Every structure is written in C-alpha cells, then in structure tokens.
Curated annotation (Swiss-Prot):
Source organism of this protein record: Avena sativa
The name this protein goes by in its record: T-complex protein 1 subunit epsilon
One Pfam family here: Cpn60_TCP1
Gene Ontology CC annotation, any one: chaperonin-containing T-complex
Family, similarity comment: Belongs to the TCP-1 chaperonin family.
Keywords: ATP-binding, Chaperone, Cytoplasm, Nucleotide-binding
InterPro entries documented for this protein: Chap_CCT_epsi (IPR012718), Chaperone_TCP-1 (IPR017998), Chaperonin_TCP-1_CS (IPR002194), Cpn60/GroEL/TCP-1 (IPR002423), GroEL-like_apical_dom_sf (IPR027409), GROEL-like_equatorial_sf (IPR027413), TCP-1-like_intermed_sf (IPR027410), TCP-1_chaperonin (IPR053374)
Entry's localization field: Cytoplasm
Subunit (UniProt): Heterooligomeric complex of about 850 to 900 kDa that forms two stacked rings, 12 to 16 nm in diameter.
Function, in words: Molecular chaperone; assists the folding of proteins upon ATP hydrolysis. Known to play a role, in vitro, in the folding of actin and tubulin.
Gene Ontology MF annotations: ATP binding; ATP hydrolysis activity; ATP-dependent protein folding chaperone; unfolded protein binding
Major location category of this protein: cytoplasm
Length: 535
C-alpha cells in the first residue's frame, strides 16, 4: 500500500495490485495509440499496388508464407499491442465484407492517425477531430457515388467483370496469368450466381490445388474434385452415368455401443463369426446395388476385407471423404446425404455423367473428378503450381477475384483505380471544408490530406517521385475536370485509368473509407490506457 496525491494535493491510497499496473493518460495515451497504429500501416504500405512488395512470414512451427495480401500478413503477424490488434481486425473486416482492399484500408487508417496526431499537437480536442473525420467520410462516400459508373454485363458479355478482376490480380504474385485467372474466377462466380436475385453463394465454389505443373494449367471444372482415389487399385478408374450413394454412416457391420466381449474357444465359432460379418456386409453391398448405386462415397473408412468384398462385387467405393466435400458432392449431384444405412433409397442417390480418377506426376498422386453433374451450381477451381507456397498464394488471389466478381454482381457500380478515386475525393473534401465553420474544418482538411496516402504509396512503390507525381495528377483532375486520372504504376504512358482498364468496385472503395474512419474514431477516443505490469 502507498500514499499519493492528486492534482489538488488531496491524499489517496494506492493498493498494492494497482501499483503494479502501468498507466498512460491524456495526450501521451493518444500518441502511444497512434504510434502503434502507424507502425502497422507502415509495414503494409510497401505491399500496396501492382508494384507492391511481398512479405515472408514464418510461424512458430516453421511454416513459411510469402504473400502481399494485407489480411493474411496481419493474420500471421505476432501482434501484442491492443491498438495494433484493432488494425488487424480492421483488415479482417474488410476481407470478410468485401474480400479485396485489405492493404489499402490499413494504409488509409494509418494516414488518418498521422494527420490526427498533428491536430492533437495543435491543441484540438480529439472528439472534434473525430466529428470532423465523420463529416469528411460522408462527403467522400457521397462523392464516390457521384463519380461512379454503372458497368453493364450479362452471362454472355463477361468482359467488364474480367477487367475488374484483372485489376485485383495485378498486385498479386500471379499477375503474369491475370487474364486467364480472372476469366476462371468470373466463370466460376457466374456458374453459382442467381443473376435475377443478384445473389452469389461462394461456398459452392471449391478451390483445390496440387503441386506440379505450371500456373497456366489452372482450370475450372464443372463439378467437384476430391483429393481421394478409389479404395482398391483394381476398381474401375472411369464410371459413366454414375449413381452415387453418399454415406455419413460407417460402411461396415455395426459395433455394440455398450461394453462387451465375445468368447471364442473353437475354430468353428471364429469361422461362424467371420461368416456372419461377411454375410452382413454382403447384404449392405447388395442393398447398394439393389437401389441402383454404381459408386459409394463414404465419410468413414472400411477395413481391407470389406474393401476386397466391394471389389469382388464390382461396387467401386471411395473412403475418408471430408464432410464439407460430401456436402458439395450432394449439392452438385442432386443426391441426399444418408446418415443411417437403413434409410438408403433410390431417390437419395446423386447423379453424375462422369466420375474419373486422374493421376498426377511420377508419384502417381490421384484425384477424383466428379463431372457432368445433375446440378451444375457447384464448381471447382483446380490450381497447379511449382510449390506449395505458390499454390497457397494463388488460392488467396483467386479468393479476392471471386469476391470482386460477387460484389459487381450485387452492385454493378465501379470507380476507377490507380488512386484516382482517392485523389478525386481528396479534392472534393478539401473544397467542402470551407463550408464548415468551426474547428471541424481542420479535421476535414486533414482527412483530405490523409486520402492522398494511397496515391503517394502507389507512386512510391512504383519507383516514381511520389510528391511530384501526385501534384501533376491533382492539377490534371482540377484543370480537365477528369476524375479518371490516377498513378501510372505500369508506365503505360497514360494516367487515364479508363484507358488502362483499371477498375475497382464502388462498394469496396466506400467500405474502405467508412471502416478506416470508424477505427480511427475509436482510437482517438481512448485517453487512458491501463495495462498490467510485466513483473
């Protein structure tokens, strides 16, 4: 216990547990929080844009990941600071809602914090800064709506969707194949989309990968690929017009659930037991054949004796198939999952035009292709690549492209990329600042400056002089009244993003601004940080 005095020299007692806690208050707390947020943004800043750098992250158990996906980088980083964890959550929210723009949203939040720090040092109250930021974000979101363009597409004319997905893939390690991968992503989304209701269920798209081959061998399969093979090497490798029994129950004689033992003291008794088990399993196989099944896919395993019997009775089977894959197979083939063997019937069988086993490489890795299904609303993107890291990064890139295509189907408004939308919003917010009397005007101007962080980072990562490039593009915006001018990252020779076909979804860009503002407001309102001491 200790005695201390407050600012009016009134004595108060500190309990021993409280003595052990460290505490930051007022401006010190806000500066510490801002510094933590800025440090996270600084890490991601170099990964922004088509010329952004990748990060290599090693997990405690030695797994190595190479990526430039903002959400993945922050997910794998070992972050202790609570404010830094907020930035990780921010990136995760953007990934969950939109799927793309996870790096940009953190860079923008870091820039907003940097500008807020300058205002706090000038004595402006954090609440006034937060209110100014809120006003500015509304102005920016409304301005994005006004400069957006409706992008018309149909099931036959998919070029607008492909171009927007290509913009997303430009910043990824797979950018050399961006056209092919964008087309695959768009076709996959359209296969599972309900265009009338503007609804897309991405769970119906399975992304599978296999080491070997090259990235260009990546394909879209109208059906399901399962990383399994037939349970017996002598079973047929190709089944046409397959009727599939999908079982989640054990495909073997039942075992008593209570504690039991069987005394066998003669050879005859053992043979009787074995014969009984064989007969029971024979009846199960016969029931499958009676209902018309030509292939059994089972969630559980069965022993080698059962496997041999299946081969003898000419009933191909696949064992140890995961629950998620079983669901997709059921959706694709129009079958029903059978939880109890007694419930198996002809109506519950799935139908597929072709089931084939395909071999890969010299090691004879095999996978099962279920194609020409009764219901085509379940597809698989099958990725090939030189190593596991490449395949994992391609999966992340494909996920972003799928999300962008989904967002365009839900809302077909686009804005132009390359930092053009941020520059246009910055000019609009700057112009609107004069209409707001009071201290908030400073915060609105600071918000406009913070929006410039995205084009500055794009220019810097592309090896261009950032400030010179930004001022030239800004003057172009004002002189020509052209909101399509952005940073020419690829040195094409024009900074008109319409000519370069660089597009981003409107809802993705609006969400970026709103989420970043929300988190920054939350951080600015923290004026007291109490943490337990380390000893």
């Amino acid at each position: 216990m200790a005695l201390d005095f407050d600012e009016y020299w009134r004595p108060f007692i500190i309990l021993r547990e409280q003595e052990k806690k460290s505490r930051l208050q007022g401006l010190d707390a806000q500066k510490a929080n801002i510094a933590a947020g800025k440090s996270v943004a600084r890490i991601l800043r170099t990964s922004l844009g088509p010329k952004g750098m990748d990060k290599m992250l090693q997990s405690p158990d030695g797994d190595v990941t190479i990526t430039n996906d903002g959400a993945t980088i922050l997910e794998l980083m070992d972050v202790d600071n609570q404010i830094a964890k907020l930035m990780v959550e921010l990136s995760r929210s953007q990934d969950y809602d939109i799927g793309d723009g996870t790096t940009g949203v953190v860079v923008m939040a870091g820039s907003l914090l940097e500008q807020a720090e300058k205002l706090l040092e000038r004595g402006i109250h954090p609440i006034r800064v937060a209110e100014g930021y809120e006003m500015a974000s509304r102005i920016a979101v409304d301005h994005l709506e006004s400069i957006s363009t409706k992008y018309e597409f149909s099931a036959t004319d998919i070029e607008p969707l492909v171009q927007t997905c290509m913009t997303t893939l430009s910043s990824k390690i797979v950018s050399r194949c961006k056209r092919a991968l964008a087309e695959i992503a768009v076709k996959a989304v359209l296969a599972v989309a309900d265009l009338e209701r503007k609804d897309v269920n991405l769970d119906l798209i399975k992304v599978e990968g296999k080491v070997g081959g090259k990235l260009e061998d990546t394909e879209l399969v109208q059906g399901i690929i399962v990383d399994k093979d037939m349970s017996h090497p002598q079973m047929p490798k190709r089944i046409e017009d397959a009727h599939i029994a999908i079982l989640t129950c054990p495909f073997e004689p039942p075992k008593p659930k209570t504690k039991h033992k069987v005394d066998i003291d003669t050879v005859e008794k053992f043979q009787t037991l074995r014969g009984q088990e064989q007969k029971y399993f024979d009846e199960m196989v016969q029931k499958c054949k009676d209902v018309g099944a030509t292939l059994v896919i089972c969630q559980w395993g069965f022993d080698d004796e059962a496997n041999h019997l299946l081969m003898q009775r000419e009933l191909p089977a696949v064992r140890w198939v995961g629950g998620v894959e079983l669901e997709l197979i059921a959706i694709a083939t129009g079958g029903r999952i059978v939880p109890r063997f007694q419930e198996l019937s002809t109506e519950k069988l799935g139908k597929a035009g072709l089931v084939r086993e395909k071999s890969f490489g010299t090691t004879k890795d095999r996978m099962l292709y279920i194609e020409k299904c009764a219901n085509s609303k379940a597809v698989t993107i099958f990725i090939r690549g030189g190593n596991k890291m490449m395949i994992e990064e391609t999966k992340r890139s494909i996920h972003d492209a799928l999300c962008v295509a989904r967002n365009l189907i839900i809302n077909n408004s686009i804005v132009y990329g390359g930092g053009s939308a941020e520059i246009s919003c910055s000019i609009a917010v700057e112009a609107a600042a004069d209409r707001h009397p009071g201290v908030e005007q400073y915060a609105i101007r600071a918000f406009a400056d913070a929006l410039d962080a995205i084009p500055l980072a794009l220019a810097e990562n592309s090896g261009l002089p950032p400030i010179d490039t930004l001022t030239v593009v800004k003057s172009q915006h004002v002189k020509e009244n052209n909101s399509r001018c952005g940073i020419d990252c690829n040195d094409v020779g024009t900074n008109d993003m319409k000519e370069q076909n660089v597009f981003e979804t409107l809802i993705g860009k609006q969400q970026q601004i709103l989420l970043a503002t929300q988190v920054v407001k939350m951080i600015l309102k923290i004026d007291d940080v109490i943490t337990p001491s380390e000893y």
